[in-house]
């Protein structure tokens, strides 16, 4: 019984620690890697097939398992 209680407390503690460690600011969570569409430098988005809205992207090109999005004025 004490082993089950210990595992339960371990899971609850890890969930609390993970939620407290998660950054709330979008700029902290956005760690884009540079990519190139021809000679234009953009930001690579993994597992997306089109650019996300609200970031000012005007063009994109397909990359391996994602998309490279670039703004109007790079």
UniProtKB/Swiss-Prot annotation:
Record-level Gene Ontology MF annotations: ion channel inhibitor activity; potassium channel regulator activity; toxin activity
Compartment(s) where it occurs, according to its Swiss-Prot or TrEMBL record: Secreted; Nematocyst
Principal location: secreted
Signal peptide: 1-21
Keywords: Cleavage on pair of basic residues, Disulfide bond, Ion channel impairing toxin, Nematocyst, Neurotoxin, Potassium channel impairing toxin, Secreted, Signal, Toxin, Voltage-gated potassium channel impairing toxin
Residues cleaved off as propeptide: 22-29
InterPro entries in the record: BDS_K_chnl_tox, Myo_ane_neurotoxin_sf
SUPFAM superfamilies: Defensin-like (SSF57392)
GO CC, one annotated term: nematocyst
Disulfide bonds: 35-68, 37-61, 51-69
Annotated function: Potently and selectively inhibits voltage-gated potassium channels Kv11/KCNH/ERG. Acts as a gating-modifier toxin that shifts the voltage-dependence of ERG activation in the positive direction and suppresses its current amplitudes elicited by strong depolarizing pulses that maximally activate the channels.
Note: Negative results: does not show effect on crabs.
Record protein name field: U-actitoxin-Bgr3a
Lineage: Eukaryota, Metazoa, Cnidaria, Anthozoa, Hexacorallia
